[in-house]
Amino acid sequence: MADNSFEFFPPKSAEGRAKLRGTWQELAKLKPRFFSCTYGAGGSTRDGTLETVMEIRRAGHLAAPHISCVASTRKDIAEQLERYRANGIRHLVALRGDLPSGLAAAGEFRYAADLVAFIRQTSGDWFHIEVACYPEYHPQTRNAADEVRNFKMKVDAGANSAITQYFYNADAYFRFVDECRAAGLTLPIVPGVMPITNFSQLARFSDACGAEIPRWMRLKLESYRDDAAAIRAFGLDAVSALCEKLLAGGAPGLHFYTLNQATLSAEIWRRLKL
């Protein structure tokens, strides 16, 4: 049976925390392998990340905080790792991360592979480390060979498993996995799944992260304009079909980018009848 996992971002208000509590409690009924919580640009939400993770853990569920290294010193990261260890956390999602708006590149880590190596150097095998990978290539990647090479650097540094950027073309995932296997990488590569709720928001996210919205899907979504119900129905059908194809093709599980909403991710998972 395939695994699932669900990603949140830390809320900024008491109302947001209450809403997120209802979200993860609903998704917990689906028995996920773990929940994860993002870290904010430049680590800007690190306290909220830890608070969210610990609340989920206190309810008896596995939760993994993200940790990013952009704009961070080794001392910063060492202190954050110690906070996680002191709280019994053993599962991390390690990323380079994004700079806060208006800041130039800084910090002592250039790549996510450097962060993974530092975690292993300072913490040994304490943490299970998830990393990111990009079947449709990172926006800064120059060519296909570089994408696999960069991913291999993270694996060689000590990554245990990987979560992909979201995509809507299953063939991109299968091709990327084949390239990774040919390069000797055997770790689990779990597809990231983005439910579709709002086309303009999705287009903005996709332009920023390099995820392609296939032409047929883009035109279909554009035709619905502001018809939220039609977009939701189409999105459920399209993303559910994508997930079915991924699992049938051997994907080890699915990681849902929930945007702190339970309904669509839960409905897609239930449609898969797993």
List each language-model region with its residue ranges.
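Catalytic domains of carbohydrate-active enzymes, especially glycoside hydrolases
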Residues: 25-38, 156
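Conserved, mostly hydrophobic/aromatic
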Residues: 7, 35, 84, 154, ...
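Catalytic beta/alpha-barrel core
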Residues: 34-45, 67-69, 93-95, 160-169, ...
